[in-house]
Amino acid sequence: MNELLSYLKQFDIENAEEKSGLLMQYMQSVLEWNEKVNLTAITDTEEFVQKHFIDSLLCAESLEFTASSSICDVGTGGGFPGVPLAVCYPDKEFLLMDSLAKRVRIVNDICAQLGVTNVTVVHGRAEELARQLEYRDRFDLCVSRAVANMRVLSEYCLPFVRAGGTFIAYKGPDCESEINDARRAVRLLGGEEPEIRKTSHLDHSLVFVRKSAPTPDAYPRKAGVPAKKPL
């Protein structure tokens, strides 16, 4: 907890002690549920703080995050990065999405129990949710830590972002080749040139894609197609 609290204070998070405590309660709840439903492979508390909490908060240092009020998290799993961001930035609204109904119910329930009111978690595949008018071309920012190739992840995520908004993908240290291969897909989906920003944490990278035009109606393709036939 001390490491998490130090990090929150380092980045001038208001009410850092309270938010650090809330996140630690969230961790305990996730780990308890994890014995019944697969929410995370990380069960060591120090590693959880490093790889789930601090890692999730890396994008908050960016101007793009600061300027955003509506944020969606695609493939949230156990609530990452969406829940840590929502806890630390209660003035922003978060929509979290996951394809497994059990995970959605659990994350919703834990957030409700802890009083995290700026989070909504919905069940569905990104390819289908992005076809719904209430979600399409709507968000200032889309974030995702989902394990998927950038060509696939862009088709999942960019349709949710409004023109002028940003998509941020959490990636590993050596993602240049993957991002180069995704340039055509990003352009097709209304995005501009991807920008890789290195972080000081765990050698991770954040890939920023600004969206300059609405995503064409043809995308995303039907559920399962993006993964099988990447753009």
What is the predicted role of each segment?
Residues 89, 161-163:
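Helix-to-beta-strand junctions that scaffold the AdoMet/dcAdoMet cofactor pocket
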Residues 103-105, 175, 179:
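Short alpha-helix immediately C-terminal to the canonical SAM-binding loop
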Residues 30, 85, 171, 209:
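Residue-level signal for inorganic ion chemistry
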Residues 57-148, 154:
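Conserved SAM/SAH cofactor-binding pocket of Class I
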Residues 164-174:
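Conserved beta-strand signature within the Rossmann-like core of class I S-adenosyl-L-methionine
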Residues 180-231:
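SAM/dcSAM-binding transferase cores
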Residues 2-67, 72, 102-105, 109-119:
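Class I SAM-dependent transferase core
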